[in-house]
């Protein structure tokens, strides 16, 4: 039997639930699917179906993640929910599930907790553009004044991390009561869904962003010239376009004279395509794996940056011991390993396996990176951590 076809008749958005353990993230995810299933826009997923998340591997790291999909009248949503706190940290840092927006779930009965803060900080550092708040368990804390205080605390915390705390929509409800079919609380879940549709803009599609393709391989075709192959990360490219070769060496411009996929000429290549690009006036030794082809001026080479990283535990196949400033692992960006030196920040003296830390990294060679670029940290070919560039320093 053929797979069901994915019909692209609505804008697509990636969302996820974030927040402290036991504040109701998974229950809310189940409630959203149940409420939408009554309108024929989702398959209802029970709590234990979502909680029993399969393991996935991303950048050499195992992460438990549940993917749920649903539609509204306006959009198609892919919703990610992680069972454990460590899974959230790993998921957000590796970019395993890129979020266009997050639903921050805070228990009205408990208010802000340590992971509430940590997830907001992570959302800021990995570049989640929008957050909406669902104040959950309001049935357990019916005192209006207490809920007002909790809401104020959440808004202040969001502002502290540069989200527009005063303007972010806060919906009060009870995911459990909504699941049980209580009409008042079902209405609150509907309000949350409507807020997702209206408060979050359609994301700029990858194909509309400036062209970028990491170079995976380079070879010469006799009589035609040098071809570089790779997967287009974003944007589009066609024969006649001017591009820059960025990273590792001096940036240089060239013209793409042909684009091919599976030995056939393409009118244009776009995000997601695996292609070969024929370059004018470029020799085999002028370009190498680890560089990128990009729209001129859209990306610059950098060698120093601040990063947010997650360090694997021994059980996850990571280091058995802590590391300190001057640690020199390899940083794997897109298609290549580059050695770099780590400096720990603030009063942090060492980073232990399992830690989530902020580091300053100086690479031996400059490469094409931007805020939000993801990388792995490797030692002797095995992954010991994952990171995301949070700020460029040169």
Swiss-Prot record:
GO cellular component: cytosol
Residues covered by region (G5): 174-176
Region (G2): 60-64
Signal peptide start and end residues: none
Keywords per UniProt: Cytoplasm, Elongation factor, GTP-binding, Hydrolase, Magnesium, Metal-binding, Nucleotide-binding, Protein biosynthesis
NCBIfam families for the chain: EF-Tu, PRK00049.1, PRK12735.1, PRK12736.1, small_GTP
Domain tr-type G intervals: 10-204
Protein origin, superkingdom: Bacteria
Record-given protein name: Elongation factor Tu
Region (G4) location: 136-139
Binding site for GTP: 19-26, 81-85, 136-139
Summary of subunit composition and partner proteins: Monomer.
Residue span of region G1: 19-26
One MF term in the entry's GO annotations: GTPase activity
Keyword Nucleotide-binding: yes
């Amino acid at each position: 039997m053929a797979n069901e076809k994915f019909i692209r008749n609505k804008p697509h958005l990636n969302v996820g639930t974030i927040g402290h353990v036991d504040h109701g993230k998974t229950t809310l995810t189940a409630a959203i699917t149940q409420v939408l299933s009554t309108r024929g826009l989702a398959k209802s997923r029970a709590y234990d179906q979502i909680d029993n998340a399969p393991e996935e591997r991303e950048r050499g790291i195992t992460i438990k993640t549940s993917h749920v999909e649903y539609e509204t009248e306006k959009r198609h949503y892919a919703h990610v929910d992680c069972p454990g706190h460590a899974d959230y940290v790993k998921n957000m840092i590796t970019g395993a599930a890129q979020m266009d927006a997050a639903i921050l779930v805070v228990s009205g009965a408990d208010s802000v907790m340590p992971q509430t803060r940590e997830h907001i900080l992570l959302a800021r550092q990995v570049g989640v553009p929008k957050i909406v708040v669902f104040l959950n368990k309001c049935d357990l804390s019916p005192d209006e004044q207490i809920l007002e205080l909790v809401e104020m605390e959440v808004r202040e915390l969001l502002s502290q991390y540069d989200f527009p705390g005063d303007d972010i929509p806060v919906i009060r409800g009870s995911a459990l009561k909504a699941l049980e079919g209580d009409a008042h609380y079902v209405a609150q879940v509907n309000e949350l869904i409507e807020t997702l549709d209206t408060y979050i803009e359609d994301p700029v599609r990858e194909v509309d962003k400036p062209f970028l393709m990491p170079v995976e391989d380079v070879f010469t075709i006799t009589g035609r010239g040098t071809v570089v192959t790779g997967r287009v990360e974003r944007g589009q490219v066609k024969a006649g376009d001017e591009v820059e070769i960025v990273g590792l060496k001096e940036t240089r411009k060239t013209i793409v004279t042909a684009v091919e996929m599976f030995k056939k000429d393409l009118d244009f290549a776009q995000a997601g395509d695996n292609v070969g690009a024929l370059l004018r006036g470029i020799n085999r030794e002028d370009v190498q794996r680890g560089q990128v082809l990009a729209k001129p001026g859209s990306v610059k080479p950098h060698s120093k940056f601040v990063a947010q990283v997650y360090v694997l535990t021994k059980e996850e196949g990571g280091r058995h011991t802590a590391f300190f400033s001057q640690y020199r692992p390899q940083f794997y960006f897109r298609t290549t390993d580059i050695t770099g030196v780590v400096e720990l920040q603030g009063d942090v003296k060492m980073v232990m396996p399992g830690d989530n830390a902020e580091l300053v990294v100086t690479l031996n060679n400059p490469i094409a990176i931007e805020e939000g670029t993801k990388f792995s940290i490797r030692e002797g070919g095995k992954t010991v951590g994952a990171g995301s560039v949070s700020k460029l320093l040169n």
